[in-house]
A protein has these predicted regions:
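Long, compositionally biased intrinsically disordered regions
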Residues: 2-126, 305, 323, 489-490
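Positively charged, helix-rich recognition surfaces that bind polyanionic ligands
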Residues: 3, 233-491
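Generic detection of short hydrophobic beta-strand segments and adjacent strand-loop junctions
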Residues: 8-14, 196-202, 274-277
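Beta-strand secondary-structure signal
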Residues: 11-13, 136, 236-238
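Short amphipathic alpha-helical segments
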Residues: 23, 27-30, 129-133, 349, ...
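Stable alpha-helical structural segments in soluble proteins, enriched in small hydrophobic residues
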Residues: 38, 132-145, 466-476
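Long, hydrophobic, amphipathic alpha-helical segments used as structural scaffolds
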Residues: 39-46, 141-152, 368, 420-423
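Acidic carboxylate diad motif detector
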Residues: 63-230, 385-386, 398, 402, ...
Length: 491
């Protein structure tokens, strides 16, 4: 297994001649074909493995062992024997997957054999680029192997995909970046698919990017990305450097407690206490506009493909839609532009918030929040007593899509590691910060709708999230620092 080292990315816009763009477009199409062939090969091997009785027996035995572990945990009994059984089943399943060629190495081997065939269009890719595509294929197949998605839900790449990319494993062969001897030229990009060099001038990099390049230990590899912005194709070069980039902020002094929510985040430091909204401004108006665009796109599709729909308006099974019309493509581009602007605004807000937090912290304590669990549908069926109908099983999927709380957590941990700030994840099950009252030293369970409550007759109107963030900042080794809490709590 390759050693994992810290890295960061520098993006530069490329200005390419039309001839090179055409060659890149051809390479993107062939890259999609390689990926699709790998997916097709993997799904066929998976279906063959599913028909094996030994595989079915292993899955059944593992499922029973896992159910037994859950029962023993509820009864607070030892689970050592069953845990060993699960490990043995996992080992046997791994060997079976190897026997059926469902490993990254076997995928690399298969795609390399296809590349070496006489007249194969895959020959313009070197071995490193084929290995990268095989790794991407394996990531998708792992979701099928571990039953996170069903095989028919796997998405094949299309020639209509707007954002595509390819990269190499190293910066020594194939598509690579080399330093230039010319005065105003910073680097020379060798594009393997076009067999030509492209000069990248110094002015293409801003001051911070130039500083970041000098900080890098080495360039790991480069990646060429094609994005569609306002209906036009734009090419970017991503330079992946080893090491840490220069920081624009310096770390502070003190402990910062963070209580992350779905749409908001509360933090408490020695100098500031704040509750910040993660949702971009004017999102309600933009969402209404997106719904209108969705309806227009569907109407256009129905008009152009009437044979694909039944009389009641539902889609026929196995229906094949025609190529989208110009109007439909125009509407899709408008919708894509709106999603891109929302994403950029959200990323900008989160970056500003991360800088604001780390500039006040030498230690960060954050409550662990399982976002993956919150976006799933509820299993319980609850009946509304007024209408006698079941409540919706939907939970927080839309709110998570709006605010992207996991992206904030990743950005915070990345920035903290760059500045040498310790990040401690606090388990909410152990310390229960939303229930604890440091004045009475008791735990009082509250409903989710209760956002403001009274600690005592003296301390009234305490905001729940801010108080939880304050408590999280005063937890050490799974216990509340009672003396420090009494001392730091404002009068």
């Amino acid at each position: 297994m390759r050693a994992q080292t810290p890295s960061y990315v520098i993006s530069v816009k490329l200005h390419l001649p039309k001839q090179i763009e055409n060659r890149l477009e051809k390479s993107f199409r062939i890259s999609n074909s390689v990926y699709n062939e790998g997916i097709s090969f993997g799904l066929k091997r998976f279906e063959a493995m599913k028909r094996n009785p030994y595989y079915q027996e292993l899955l059944k035995a593992r499922r029973l062992a896992k159910a037994g572990i859950d029962k023993l945990k509820k009864a607070k009994k030892k689970t050592k024997g069953l845990v060993q059984q699960v490990k043995l089943h996992d080992k046997a399943l791994l060997e079976l997957r190897k026997a059926y060629g469902l490993t990254e190495f076997e995928l690399q081997k298969y795609l390399s054999q296809q590349r070496r065939k006489t007249g194969s269009p895959y020959q313009q890719f070197n071995a490193g680029e084929i290995q990268v595509i095989a790794g991407q294929v394996m990531k998708t197949l792992e979701k099928v192997l571990f039953y996170q998605i069903k095989p028919h839900k796997v998405r094949f790449r299309s020639k209509f995909d707007l954002d595509v990319s390819f990269r190499n494993r190293v910066n020594t062969t194939g598509t690579r970046l080399e330093p230039s001897d010319k005065k105003d030229i910073a680097y020379r990009l060798y594009i393997h698919k076009a067999s030509t060099f492209v000069d990248i001038p110094v002015k293409a990099f801003n001051k911070y990017q130039q500083m970041s390049l000098t900080y890098s230990e080495k360039i790991k590899y480069v990646q060429i990305i094609r994005k569609t912005i306002r209906g036009k194709k734009v090419y970017y070069l991503q330079i992946v450097c080893q090491g840490f980039p220069p920081s624009k902020v310096t770390k502070g002094q003190g402990v910062v407690g963070i209580d992350p929510g779905i749409s908001t985040v509360a933090f408490a430091s020695p100098t500031e206490v704040a509750l910040v909204d993660l949702v971009p401004k004017n999102i309600t108006q933009k969402e209404k506009h997106l719904k209108r665009l969705d309806r227009k796109i569907e109407q256009s599709q129905r008009v152009n493909n009437p044979e694909c729909y039944k009389e009641n308006g539902t889609i026929k099974k196995g229906a094949r839609f025609k190529r989208p019309s110009k109007r439909q493509m125009h509407l899709r581009n408008r919708r894509r532009k709106m999603y891109r602007s929302l994403s950029e605004e959200r990323t900008k807000l989160q970056g500003q918030l991360v800088n604001r937090i780390v500039s006040q912290a030498s230690v960060i304590r954050v409550e662990g929040l399982n976002i993956k669990g919150l976006q799933k549908r509820s299993r319980d069926i609850r009946i509304n007593p007024k209408t006698n109908r079941p409540y919706s099983k939907k939970r927080y999927g839309k709110a998570i899509f709006r605010a992207a709380p996991s992206a904030l957590r990743v950005a915070l941990e990345t920035r903290a590691s760059q500045l040498g700030i310790d990040v401690e994840v606090i388990s909410p099950k152990e310390v229960k910060p939303s229930q604890y009252n440091h004045i009475t030293q008791t735990f009082d369970k509250k409903s989710l709708s209760t956002r403001v409550y009274d600690l005592s007759d003296e301390y009234t109107g305490v905001q729940r999230d801010l108080y939880s963030a304050f408590l999280i900042g005063h937890i050490e080794k799974g216990r509340y620092q009672q003396e420090q809490l009494n001392q730091d709590f404002p009068d």
